[in-house]
Amino acid sequence: METSQIRNGFNKVEVDVVGPLKDLLVRVMKNINTPFKILNETFKINYCDQQETKTKSSFYIQTLDANDKSSLELTKSAIKNIQMQQQQQQQQQQQQQQQQHHDIFQFTQPSSSHNHSNHHHHHHQQQLQQQQQQQLQQQMKTPKLLFFIVMSVGVGKSYIKNIKEEAGTIPILEWFTNYIRSWEEVFKLTSNQVTSHIKRQLLTKACTTGNINLLDEILLSGISKEQIKETQTIGHGIILKSLIVNNLDSIVVSGSMSLLGAVIDNDNDKKGSSLILSKLNLNLFPKSIITACFNLAELDLSYNNIKEIPKEICQLKHLKILNMNNNQLDDLPLELANLTNLKYLAVQDNPLNKFPHHIIEQGTKRTLVFLKNIIEGKKSETWNKVKLMFVGQEGVGKSSLCKALMGSRRRSSSSFAAELQKSGDTISTEGVKIQSIKGKKIDFYAWDFGGQQVFYPTHQFFLTNQALYLLVFKLTDPNFAERVNYWTLQIKANSGLSVPMIFLVGTHCDACTPEQLSSAEQILKENFVKYSRIRQNAISFVSCTNGTGIKELKKILTNEAEKSNLIKSNIPGSYLILEQRLTDRGANSSRILINQNNINQNNNNNNNNNNHNNCNNNENCTTTAATAGTTTMTSTTTTTTNYSNENILNTSSNSLIALFTRSNSNSNLSNNYQKPLVNQKYIDYNDFERECKLSHLAQEEIQGATEFLHNMGIILHYDTPILRSLVVLDPQWLADVMSSLITFSHNWIKNGILNHSELVSIWSGKYDQSIWPSLLKLLEKFEVSYELPNEFPSRSLIPSLLPEEPIDRIQEIKEKLWIPLPEAIESKRVQIFGCQYNFDFMPLGFFPRLLLRILLIKGIDIKTYWANGILLDILTTEDIKIQKLNHKKHSILPNNSSSTSSSTSSSTSSSTSSSSSSSTSSSSTSTTTTTVQIQSSPFGNSTTIVNKLTNIDNNNNNNNNNNNNNNNNNNINNNNNNNNNNNNNNNNNNNNNNNNNNNNNNNNNNIKNIINNFENQNNLNNIITNNFGGKFEIIKKNDFESPLSSKKPKHQVLVTFKNQKSFESKDKDTYKLNVEIRSFNVSNNNDKDFLASLFFQQLLSTIDTLLSGSYGGLKVTRLIPCIHCIEKDPHSEPHLFDINSCISQLLLGKSQLVCGKDSTTPVRIDYIAPDLSIKKIPILLEDQVVCEEQIGVGGFGLVHKGKLILQDKSLVVAIKSYIVGNSSASDIIRKFQEFHHEMYIMSSLNHLNIVKLFGSMQNPPRMVMEFAPHGDLYHFLEKKKNIKWSFKVRLMLDIAKGIEYLQNQNPPIVHRDLRSPNIFLFSLDENAPVCAKVADFGLSQQSLYSVSGLLGNFQWMAPETIGAEESYTEKIDTYSFSMILFTILTGECPFDEFTSFGKMEFIRKIREEDLRPTIPSDCPPTISNLIELCWSGDPKKRPHFSYIVKELTNFYYNLNLSPIPEQKSINDKSPHPDLISNGVPKLQIAK
């Protein structure tokens, strides 16, 4: 076949045109470039004149003149040539047959020499292959007549009929000169004929060379039965020669001929046939078997490299035997279950990494039933893997107990004791170690939790309620009850409402007397058994030295696991497939040996492998695949961690998904399979969802499967905004990463501060340096660490490693700044308030997480902090101005900094400064930029954070919000890049210690000179402290002076946490969080000094958010200390008021309480609980507000129209009243807190598209707000159907601007109840300054990380908020906004079109099937695209409101409308400007 490759990738086929009319045909067809396909190749036909090209093509077309009699002769001549070619081929075949008979005769004679025989066979085999190729090439070179073209170009007699008689079987095409589409007929016939000839040639080639893949492709493309039979005839001769040449040892082309024979048998309707295609090195399953051999009864494809069985195999209805042994199958299709006649399925020695191995081991019938149950959705599988949690203090024998439970049942106690003596009585565990304990019926996944207290904060991420807990303690410890008490409460807190299954296991019973054992048992029964669901067998005493009680404990564990619901007997088979697929990705990769008999042998192998791998600075891991079922399948492999090829998908702080890989080999089912696996430590949730769908899980089943595998310990997934995007496949790896920092075995993290330069000592050799920034970001997600911003060199805070109590420099700072309470009271210059949270229990790690969140609050000056406390100042307006001046005037460069790095550092600081300060603006050059940093060390005041709490220049801040967000993103990227550079520099520094020491000495001298010059210039009014890590900071001396040394206003805050000290303590509230605020040199009558109250409210919101999101199962009581008790006797404990009693008094219209210690002295509620009285807004008097007609009913009470009167002028307002009604006491308190919370949120808002709060009233509580003359959006759309597009877009834009303002607050404000009834209209004129405003902030929350809680009105709610009490972010408002857009667009409520669904069905479809309203077809693409983006099921894909406002603004202008009216300040838009000052009425605050 003559083809050539042309430039655009097509194959060119030359077709000669001969005969009298060739010029006409070539001229017409030369511009035809239509491509066509033969198999997977694309061809184009080139019609050419042989005389012009001087070449001879493989194909030709004979043109004939229908009116010329000579055309008959041309036809006869062409036919004669064809007949001669056929005769030559027949002669060649006869000669071949004669040669075959001769060879058979020679073959039957005895051979004189074996070596000669081998040489003879080899020679003939080569000769045979050469002959086959030569014959094929000769056939391709012989020109083929495709067809005749007969044209009528003249006048006269037509010989067309005679030509057709002579042509015989050769096609004839009549060309009509008056038919302009004749060229299409020519091309169609040409391409068909060329395709037929080429396929015939390829078919012969496939059979002569044994290429089954090519044969399969040809059969699938379609070929005639005649061609198949013709090829089979040719192939029979080749097979015979193959038999002779190879001495019956092998058949060269038997596979292709077998397939060809099966196809012919199928065409003859022969049933029960078999097809053997083994040992042919096939990479693909021949699909032609399915389409052309559907009558097969037996199929053998063993010993190939097939990776997949096609789903279409179910069409082989008669198949009884399928042999796929020794292939590369990774999975089995569900469609195998539809082969009802299949009796034998052989898939041994395949990897099958994505299919449960134990199912296959149980045979064909079990496998087919398993697949069928998945198809039918039956839940009939059993999960016999139980999570076993070993918890307790260090040194009590947890690891030894775990090892004892893993021991062989036949080992004697003496041998067991000898083994323990070699390893020690106790084995120290850092973090969490995961092992497997094999039982007869149950496999236990043993999680051994490190008992050192330093690891306790990280344990919460691994504890689940679907587990058996072994609370291990040492019977010889006299204080064991305190250890048991902590862990029972910890487990209870993590179990939510369910009662956990706790086994109390005392070790070292061999060292105790019977009396001691009896006493311990009595203590446990009286105090701790009540916390466990296990009552009869909850207590066990064992000895890991002599094995006492071990066998009995294992039996108890097995029995209780069987009785409990931990062994799941009705789970979908798809769960097992999902587990296997995740195992292939990296899950279960850290399981330790389960077969005790192989421990010694495997250890020896590991040692040998480790010696071999010592040349690499990589991590050696021993992994075992733990399997269910009765057959133990153990694969112990030593793997070399190679992180040089890792793929970091995204290292940003918003979306961090890194793939950590290591090579591995799997020999579980295949001895010859050595495919390297990629073990990923964690994957993106979207990737996890894809695995779920490949495991045959429906979308609505994914959440249940995720929770199941999480509770079973296979994966870790936390449905919180920060962690939702991650699925941890290897919990052991995560525990190792955490314990690598939070550990007792190194000294690089000093007092909770980690210099990133020390990561070389911690992570070098374990994790590739390129992923260190990603690991730090991952630890931030789990609130284990926090990377300090604007640090050079970079550092991170590890809160759990801070000193437990103030020591050394921390203690010195605290004593100087936080003076004793009696001294402060005696000065008569301080006002004190605060609160106390009491908990029945609080797991370790609570305050470190709270500390991280407090550090993110703006408007504070951190003085120092430790593991259970933080001391800070609330910045005043004057403080902010002084800080700005100090940062501009004085700057000390970090150690080893050059002028270039200085500029970079300043620029970075500038970005952060502008984003965190409401009053800081960027300068034109980096050298004059104000540097604002966060406190980087607990040892001194070096940093300041400025917040909008100061209310300075709010308008400027609003305008700069978008720029600040961009700066923040850039700053994050810069920090990541700096981390990588710093890490690289650290390695270089380690290699050049001598040079660095010299450089450091020089730099230290330079620093000393700078210090001396600075102190001389500033008259020693400042000091310079050297925080470790080469960080020099300027600190004013008066920063560490007593607050009484100055008469300026000062606000101090001390937050401390107290743990339970003794189990025997009689105090029920032994876990306390105390907040104390001291305001010096301020007056209660000074309405400008409300900063302390505002910060107090934000701090309480931060605490409440953490408690509700992560510790919702704990009982919390909030108490308020009596300030009169404190003032009267600061040495004694004050009376404590319950917060509910304060609220109850306020609801009764009373502003005072009575002290429990002194009933004669009233206590003002606004003094002791300023968060319950919003000082930022005026308290209006009764004669200043006139209440008129009722205009609505709110969630808390009634809404009236009224007037705000002052100096004979009035302003129409809306009055929202809190009405108690017949609610329960708890509902009354809750609703009041929400009502009050709405006032708190609104008091800090100042935007034209947010309804303004003018003031509040008491008895009953009321809010006085702006009045919307045109009502709410819901009723407006309900009444008015025809709305101009211009006004629709204006409404959309106004609402978007209001929400954008909310989300740009710091922290962002989440409305949580955005819907059309909460949007109010102030003008129906699209050219008015304001048309729409957002209102009703009763459910709003400020979100540092996330908010949580159940919500209603599911039609408007984001999927992540419906029907589940989980955390979410401000992106839920973006989703609700899409529903508002839809409502404005259509005039209808969301989902009104769906009338056949009940509420629960609605919720399920919204959450699980992405059900959304139908956008009208005439909706402009800009608006429809915006709606679809905003209602994305993935919160991360929903756009920021800056983008939404931009899109709507551009769309507004593109409508050729008038420009959007400039929105003026509230002062200008008010009908009575003299009533308003800074957005607040000029009113006298009521006393």
From Swiss-Prot:
Domain of life: Eukaryota
Extent of Basic residues compositional bias: 116-125
Domain annotation Roc: ranges: 379-564
Gene Ontology CC annotation, any one: cytoplasm
Active site residues per record: D1313 (proton acceptor)
Enzyme Commission identifier(s): 2.7.11.1
Record-linked Pfam families: COR-A (PF16095), PK_Tyr_Ser-Thr (PF07714), Roc (PF08477)
Location of the region described as Small GTPase-like in the Swiss-Prot/TrEMBL record: 379-564
Residues that, per the record, bind GTP: 392-399, 448-452, 507-510
Start and end residues of each COR domain: 678-872
LRR repeat spans: 295-316, 318-340, 341-362
Domain Protein kinase: 1185-1452
The protein, known as: Probable serine/threonine-protein kinase roco11
